[in-house]
Amino acid sequence: MPTINQLVRKGRRDKTAKVKTAALKGSPQRRGVCTRVYTTTPKKPNSALRKVARVRLTSSVEVTAYIPGEGHNLQEHSMVLVRGGRVKDLPGVRYKIIRGSLDTQGVKGRKQARSRYGAKKEKS
């Protein structure tokens, strides 16, 4: 507990909020190159093979990014656009790849929430 005199001299310091997407360096998205594309298993109550990619960003930081949607065309050396947003059941995965931009194709046959997955409107 500081004294009144100490508060007069120094004042109180505001707590700084922790940045959750440090690798983006304040940008909304970052471009990157896939260094490894693989599957991993989620945390305890869930069971699946989640598709993830190790991405080297233009900010020269290497991050693990989730590939959303069913099926993808990514492989090593693919150019991708990465945004923030964690995957709750994958520890250490704090970024997502944006579908339908750069080398990443949109999800085929997607009818709902198409803009999130880069899917074009189907001709009826």
UniProtKB/Swiss-Prot annotation:
Disordered: region residues: 1-32, 104-124
Any one GO biological process: translation
Pfam families linked: Ribosom_S12_S23
Keyword set includes Chloroplast: no
Gene Ontology MF: a single term: tRNA binding
Biased segments, Basic residues type: 108-118
Purpose: With S4 and S5 plays an important role in translational accuracy.
Subunit structure: Part of the 30S ribosomal subunit. Contacts proteins S8 and S17. May interact with IF1 in the 30S initiation complex.
Family: Belongs to the universal ribosomal protein uS12 family.
Protein name per its UniProtKB record: Small ribosomal subunit protein uS12
Organism: Rhodococcus opacus (strain B4)
Gene name, Swiss-Prot/TrEMBL: rpsL
